[in-house]
């Protein structure tokens, strides 16, 4: 079970515990829009992979975008080091992977993680998330081998947090 930190960790922990599977992280960071940091225009991971929404970045200052991408890559690497505490990443080549997040509003971070995991020659990628809009579910189903989502609303409320009673930020310590 691979969690996208930080929000995906509590969800992934419960899945790993219930299925008696190993738990690790896959450190991916959202690149937020300069005027609304919660809206993803791209994603980066700790392995220096990146994915951007080409339509969204057309009107973004390229210098700002380059700096933001680099900043988020460094943060992804920092988090990977913190969460692993010197331990090696799980060996996932030729393994089935359950990729978990707390939800997917745009799907960019999960799509990047899927692309990166495919490069690592995983056997099967199953995305497990509590909620995602219908249009994103379609994209994730095409990108991954399987999608398990508890809710796929036709009319998404705009943010993953709207589907939680308590959507407090998960700290690095937690």
Predicted regions and their residues:
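PRPP-associated nucleotide enzymes
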Residues: 1-174
């Amino acid at each position: 079970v691979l969690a996208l930190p930080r929000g995906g960790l509590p969800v992934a922990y419960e899945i790993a515990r219930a299925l008696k599977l190993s738990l690790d992280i896959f450190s991916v960071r959202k690149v937020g829009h300069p005027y609304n940091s919660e809206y993803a225009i791209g994603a980066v991971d700790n392995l220096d992979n990146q994915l951007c929404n080409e339509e969204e970045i057309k009107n973004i200052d390229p210098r700002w975008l380059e700096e933001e991408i680099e900043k988020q890559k460094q943060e992804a690497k920092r988090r990977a080091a913190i969460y692993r505490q010197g331990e090696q990443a799980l060996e996932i080549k030729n393994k089935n992977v359950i990729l978990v997040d707390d939800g997917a509003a745009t799907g960019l971070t999960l799509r990047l993680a899927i692309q990166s995991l495919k490069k690592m020659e995983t056997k099967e990628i199953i995305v497990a998330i509590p909620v995602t809009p219908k249009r994103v579910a379609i994209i994730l189903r095409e990108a991954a081998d399987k999608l398990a989502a508890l809710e796929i609303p036709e009319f998404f409320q705009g943010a993953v947090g709207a589907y939680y009673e308590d959507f407090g930020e998960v700290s690095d310590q937690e």
